[in-house]
């Protein structure tokens, strides 16, 4: 080979390697794998932790922009799957807080989210550059703002974050510096936790503390106005988004029968509130929301996204079914689909035997297979001699992996830190003796704290081994190492003994069933009609559920199924709760 041919071949290898390293996949998995920022507005606590919350996602000129609380910039994507961070020329010194964003006719992108609550609306026609300018006026007392400009070019602002005040709204004069037209705002949405069970505060809605309403967002669809809001609190598993529907931007609005429309209280990654809804590839809507982690600090959070639909009756719903398992990516979900595109790959690693090179006593390696986002393993040292090995117990077909890294007792990371990366090798074996490389990130420069990797082709494996090389900071701390694919055994049998008893307090229902041999867990589904079972709750390690999210006076219908690493059982339907 001559020198010129050798150089061309070498450059091609580098190019192919760089493409492979990006792992552009046909699926995605929550939590979203973003290079989350380390906020410093709580630096007095002395803890460094990543966080991302309150996403405002908009389409602009065929591409997408995501604005996230306290991120010192924002993200850009061409496909709603692969996101690159933008450090704008001008931005909030403290980072934006619960931001608003709106695309005005593909000519100007508007944003606002000053943490002080007093803010000018910012605008630019070049968000990739980020040369933001301010409308020469200041709007006061805005918490969690949401800007909406209707087709008739009338502009509206919605806002509110309180357990005392409602979501309010007012019309703004676009031709006069976006100043309010009326002196007093309209009070639009109040929480009614005495009627709407899901609006009650606390983990599983069990607290008597007054809940919070926040995170407004407006979506116009088929001439109807869908005013969305979050409740009851961002630090709980039941944080979700509800919706009221009206015929005009300022109402009156009617509470939707199906509520909350986006709700993810069970499983690995819980919480789905304070989000935004955007029309993505193929005309499919996507709702982005906030996952609660709340370990280093109560507002330690991550992001999620779910396909969202409007059915033939105009009912808005997000499909959170198997919502933290692999799903088809936005460009793979067809325009005609009425489901969320769950890929059908099951969790092979849940509760499986695991061993490691070392561990701290309070953070054992068993935590990497317990399917709990709040637990993690900590190695004794952060060096290249650390490893984790999972025994799947049976040879299975492995399709994808998710590796979740954690911030444990870190103190030196604030804002957008340079040179963040995780370097490692992932190997697979059928017999525990002969190993093949699945993922080689030993030379990676990518910051991927929730790295989801879809393999080019499924592989046979019983053992999965993580071999550590480098993470920044003092400690190697890992959450779950999740292995997805299909086992070769039997699916669970159909659930028996399924009972649903609605309590005297109609907001609550007690659900129970007989445990199914060989089942990992169960999906309990419910809805306001037999063909509208749009809500679901993943239950691991139990055969009962106290569901406290119902609406007084509303009929509900239920179903249940069991699942394991081999697949999903047939569903059992119960037409109505008694």
Residue ranges and their predicted role:
Residues 547-569:
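Beta-strand-rich modules
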Residues 170, 424-426, 522-524:
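Short beta-strand elements bearing conserved aromatic residues within extracellular beta-rich modules
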Residues 242, 422, 451-452, 541-546:
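Short S/T/G- and acidic-enriched coil/turn segments that sit immediately N-terminal to beta-strands
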Residues 22-208, 220-267, 282-283, 289-335, ...:
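Beta-rich carbohydrate-recognition and catalytic domains
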Residues 507-519:
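Conserved aromatic anchor
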Residues 168-182, 335-371:
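Predominantly extracellular/luminal regions of secreted and cell-surface proteins
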Residues 370-439, 449-497, 502-504, 514, ...:
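Aromatic, loop-rich ligand-recognition surfaces of beta-strand-rich domains
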Residues 442-445, 536-542:
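Short beta-strand segments within Ig-like beta-sandwich modules, predominantly Fibronectin type-III
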């Amino acid at each position: 080979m001559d020198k010129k041919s050798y150089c061309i071949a070498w450059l091609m290898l580098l190019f192919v390697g760089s493409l492979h390293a990006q792992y552009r996949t046909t699926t995605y998995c929550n939590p979203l794998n973003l290079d989350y920022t380390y906020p410093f507005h709580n630096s007095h606590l002395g803890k460094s932790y990543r966080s991302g919350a309150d996403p405002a996602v908009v389409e602009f000129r065929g591409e997408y922009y995501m604005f996230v609380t306290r991120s010192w910039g924002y993200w850009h994507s061409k496909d709603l799957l692969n996101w690159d961070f933008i450090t704008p020329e001008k931005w909030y010194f403290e980072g934006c807080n619960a931001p608003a964003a709106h695309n005005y006719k593909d000519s100007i992108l508007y944003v606002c989210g000053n943490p002080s609550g007093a803010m000018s609306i910012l605008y630019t026609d070049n968000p990739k550059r980020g040369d933001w300018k301010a409308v020469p006026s200041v709007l006061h007392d805005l918490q969690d703002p949401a800007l909406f400009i209707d087709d008739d070019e009338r502009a509206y602002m919605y806002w509110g974050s309180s357990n005392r005040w409602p979501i309010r709204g007012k019309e703004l004069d676009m031709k006069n510096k976006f100043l309010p037209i009326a002196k007093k705002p309209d009070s639009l949405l109040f929480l009614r936790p005495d009627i709407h069970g899901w609006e009650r505060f606390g983990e599983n809605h069990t607290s008597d503390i007054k809940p919070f309403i926040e995170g407004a967002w407006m979506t116009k669809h088929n001439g109807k106005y869908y005013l969305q809001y979050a409740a009851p609190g961002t630090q709980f598993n039941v944080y979700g988004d509800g919706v009221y529907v009206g015929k005009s931007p300022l109402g009156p609005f009617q509470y939707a029968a199906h509520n909350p429309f986006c709700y993810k209280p069970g499983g690995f990654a819980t919480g789905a509130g304070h989000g935004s809804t955007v029309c993505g590839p193929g005309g499919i809507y996507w709702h982005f929301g906030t996952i609660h982690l709340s370990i280093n600090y109560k507002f330690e959070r991550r992001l999620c996204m779910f396909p969202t639909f409007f059915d033939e009756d105009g009912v808005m719903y997000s499909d959170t079914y198997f919502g933290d398992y692999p799903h088809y990516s936005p460009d793979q979900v067809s325009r005609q689909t009425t489901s969320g595109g769950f890929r059908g790959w099951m969790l092979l690693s849940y509760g499986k035997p695991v061993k490691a090179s070392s561990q701290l006593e309070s953070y054992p390696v068993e935590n990497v297979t317990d399917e709990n986002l709040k637990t993690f393993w900590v190695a004794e040292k952060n060096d290249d001699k650390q490893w984790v090995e999972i025994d799947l117990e049976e040879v299975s077909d492995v399709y994808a992996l998710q590796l979740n890294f954690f911030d444990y007792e870190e103190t030196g990371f604030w804002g957008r830190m340079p040179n963040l990366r995780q370097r490692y090798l992932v190997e697979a074996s059928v017999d525990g003796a002969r190993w093949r490389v699945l993922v080689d990130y030993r030379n990676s420069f990518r910051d991927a704290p929730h790295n989801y990797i879809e393999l080019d082709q499924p592989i046979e494996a019983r053992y999965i081994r993580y071999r550590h090389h480098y993470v920044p900071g003092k400690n190697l701390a890992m959450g779950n190492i999740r292995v997805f694919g299909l086992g070769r055994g039997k699916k669970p049998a159909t659930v028996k003994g399924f009972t649903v008893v609605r309590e005297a307090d109609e907001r609550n229902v007690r659900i129970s069933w007989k445990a199914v041999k060989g089942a990992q867990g169960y999906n309990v589904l419910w809805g306001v009609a037999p063909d509208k079972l749009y809500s679901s709750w993943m239950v691991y390690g139990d055969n009962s559920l106290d569901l406290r999210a119902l609406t007084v006076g509303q009929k509900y219908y239920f179903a249940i199924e069991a699942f394991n690493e081999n697949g999903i059982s047939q569903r059992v339907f119960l037409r109505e709760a008694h």
